[in-house]
Regions:
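Short beta-strand/loop segments at the ligand-binding rim of alpha/beta enzyme cores
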Residues: 43-48, 96-101, 160, 216-226, ...
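Active-site-adjacent beta->alpha loops and helix N-cap segments on the catalytic face
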Residues: 30, 79-88, 146-150, 170, ...
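Alpha/beta catalytic cores of nucleotide-metabolism and tRNA/nucleoside-modifying enzymes
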Residues: 1-24, 104-105, 165-166, 173-176, ...
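Catalytic cores of alpha/beta
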Residues: 60-63, 235-243, 282-300, 340, ...
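Bateman/CBS regulatory modules and CBS-like beta-alpha motifs in cytosolic regions of diverse proteins
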Residues: 30-44, 51-53, 82-120, 127-129, ...
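Glycine-rich phosphate-binding active-site loops on the catalytic face of alpha/beta enzymes
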Residues: 67-82, 245-257, 296-314, 344-378
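Catalytic beta/alpha-barrel core
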Residues: 74-77, 103-104, 124-126, 164-165, ...
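Terminal amphipathic helices with adjacent charged low-complexity linkers/tails
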Residues: 76-91, 127, 131-143, 147, ...
């Protein structure tokens, strides 16, 4: 009997199996501090991360996530060049001062300017000579009525009486110059008139519109990106670093392997200043192994996602609440943050995950229905949906995620063993609407627990295990819902 019992290491719980216990509180929900850590050196103003999935996070989602205080992880089901370009798009989306603005040479044409504006989503481009000296600026107003695409840009750019500021000009001073001259783009030049940056009125305005936006030291939005473990992993990492990525995630279905750590060591040795997060894992042993080998963050979750079938297909997994609890306890005090990836169904699951020890939560299905996700929009029976698929689905594997499930050597689609499905989720509108509900639920949970910040929630949060009857009692019951709430459906 004992021999049989030794095979059972314990009992696994999900978020539905527990509730946080209310505690004495002297803080209001609006007063709590929800800042946290994404990785060893990357902070979050909101502890929410969008998943590296090809129906969840591309540049639009990453921009919106960072503007709301979180961070997006760009998926890798694309070429290295495409992924690097999306990193650059996020980094250029807004800035205190754009330190590497898109420029065009004096030989450029109207067609070149229009193409660049469309590619990068910008409204003005400085024109420089071969020595990077500023010669003019062209804006979308200059191009709006120009029909001749072959016309040289020098014929329509503004070159006389250019308004510029010197290096070291503060944003407050720049705002005065912009308003005083009624312009939207302000080139920053050095003593020899070389272009060193660009300040835009739009970026200054966003500082007040999005005060909790997650930005780097240059005022640019933060963004992370995923790499795999195959031959191009280090090359992909190099391109991402050169594009300005803030953190890299080595994204696999099973992070507790020698091959994953080999990639981790190689990336860290070549790019020591970049934080590298590794996942996915579910045990204390895996967490210690990755931390001991230099991981700057660990991602927890084997099979909790709504579109994941790993636990059914492979018979392997770990209920998510227990996995987060075990991993967080194992590496407590190491300075390495924990990302709880998957299994978040309701806003109340967020404070549960954080109280269990996670520093942030990664979401897929709850974000896939937003306007900013790259999933296809579908009309079904008169309602709007967006497509959502697991990275272990056959369709996603065909696009490039086979290595995540260690099937990269298999070319025959019929021989792929999927660990995910393809589905749809209801359309939810713009991301900021959903984020308000996520943040509101987190703040409410922290208020009930008397936690002034996330570290306090992690230290003092206590749970009660509930039965199936307790779960039923927690949900609306004995009533027909006649008006849907924005943060609840079942």
């Amino acid at each position: 009997m004992n021999a049989h019992n030794s095979k059972i290491i314990g009992e696994g719980l999900t978020y539905d199996d527990v509730l946080l216990v209310p505690n004495y509180s002297n803080v209001l929900p609006r007063e709590v501090n929800i800042q946290s850590k994404f990785s060893r050196n990357i902070t979050l103003n909101v502890p929410i991360v969008s998943a590296a999935m090809d129906t969840v996070t591309e540049s639009a989602m990453a921009i919106a996530m960072a503007q709301e205080g979180g961070i997006g992880v760009l998926h890798k089901n694309m070429t290295i060049e495409q992924q690097a370009a999306k990193v650059r798009k996020v980094k250029r989306a807004e800035s205190g001062m754009i330190i590497d603005p898109v420029t065009l040479p004096l030989t450029a044409t109207v067609a070149d300017a229009k193409a660049a504006m469309k590619e990068f989503g910008i409204g003005g481009i400085p024109i420089v000579d071969e020595h990077k000296k500023l010669k003019g600026i062209v804006t979308n107003r200059d191009l709006r009525f120009e029909k001749n695409s072959a016309r040289p840009i020098v014929e329509i750019m503004t070159s006389e009486n250019l308004v510029t500021v010197a290096e070291g000009t503060s944003l407050e001073q720049a705002e005065v110059v912009l308003q005083g001259n009624k312009i939207e783009k302000l080139p920053v030049v050095d003593a020899s008139y070389k272009l060193v940056g660009l300040i835009t009125f739009r970026d200054i305005t966003k500082l007040t519109q999005k005060p909790i936006a997650n930005k780097d030291t240059f005022g640019r939005l933060r963004v992370a990106a995923a790499i795999g473990v195959t031959g191009d992993a280090v090359k992909r990492a190099e391109a991402l670093v050169n594009a300005g990525v803030d953190a890299i995630i080595i994204d696999t279905a099973h992070g507790h392997t020698e091959g994953v750590v080999n990639v981790l060591k190689e990336v860290k040795s070549q790019f020591p200043k970049i934080d590298v997060i590794v996942g996915n894992i579910a045990t204390a042993e895996a967490a210690k192994y990755l931390v001991d080998n230099g991981a700057d963050g660990v991602k927890v979750g084997i099979g909790p996602g709504s579109i994941c079938t790993t636990r059914i297909v492979a018979g392997v997994g770990f209920p998510q609440f227990s996995a987060v609890l075990e991993v967080a306890a194992a590496i407590k005090g190491s300075g390495v943050p924990v990302i709880a990836d998957g299994g978040i169904r309701y806003t109340g699951d967020i404070p549960k995950a954080l109280a269990a020890g996670a520093d942030s939560v990664m979401m897929g299905s709850l974000l896939a229905g937003t306007k900013e996700s790259p999933g296809e929009t579908i009309i079904f029976e008169g309602r709007k949906f967006k497509s959502y698929r697991g990275m272990g689905s056959v369709e996603a594997m065909q696009e490039g995620s086979k290595d995540r499930y260690f099937q990269d050597v298999e070319d025959d689609i019929k021989k792929l063993v999927p660990e995910g499905i393809v589905g749809r989720v209801p359309y939810k509108g713009e991301l900021n609407e959903s984020m308000q509900q996520f943040i509101g639920g987190l703040r409410a949970g922290m208020g009930y627990c008397g936690s002034k910040d996330i570290s306090t929630l992690q230290e003092t949060g206590r749970f009660v295990r509930i039965t199936t009857s307790g779960i039923n009692e927690s949900h609306p019951h004995n009533v027909t819902i006649t008006k849907e709430a924005p943060n609840y459906s079942r």
